[in-house]
Structure formats: structure tokens, C-alpha cells
Amino acid sequence: MHYEVDVTIPRPLDEQTTRFLESVCRSANRVSRFHGDDAGIRLTVEVSGMCREDAIRSAVREIAGIFPGRTDGRYGEPKEI
């Protein structure tokens, strides 16, 4: 099954981070979109998994590769796609 998981990173979305995330979305990465403000960044990650827990674990691994040390974010409920 394929899921979308929303991940919130407690980091402001500045110009440099916006440019970085735009290039991440264009790469072979699983981040499909993002938005944010001064309070945090919300990324939508497309992942595969057999269940909700697998989807969240996959999202954690994906975000850890993009923002090392930032896996303390909040993860939304996976949605089947």
C-alpha cells in the first residue's frame, strides 16, 4: 500500500530552506510537497508500508535523511493513496 504522511518539523521556513526543499521535491526523493511559516515546516512524504506503523517508520527514515537530527517532528495520520 502507498501512503502520504504529513510531517511537521519545528524549524522556520526561510528562503534558504525553501530553495533546499524545492530541490528535494525535484529529486528522486519521496517528498511530494511542503509549506510552512515561522513556526514550522510541514512536508508531505509518499511512502509504502503494510500498515500505519510501517508508513510512519518509512516517513521517519525519509525525513531523517533530509534533516538529520530532526526526527522529533510530529507525524500525521497516514492516508492511503
What are these regions (language model features)?
Residues M1-I81:
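Long, contiguous binding/interaction regions
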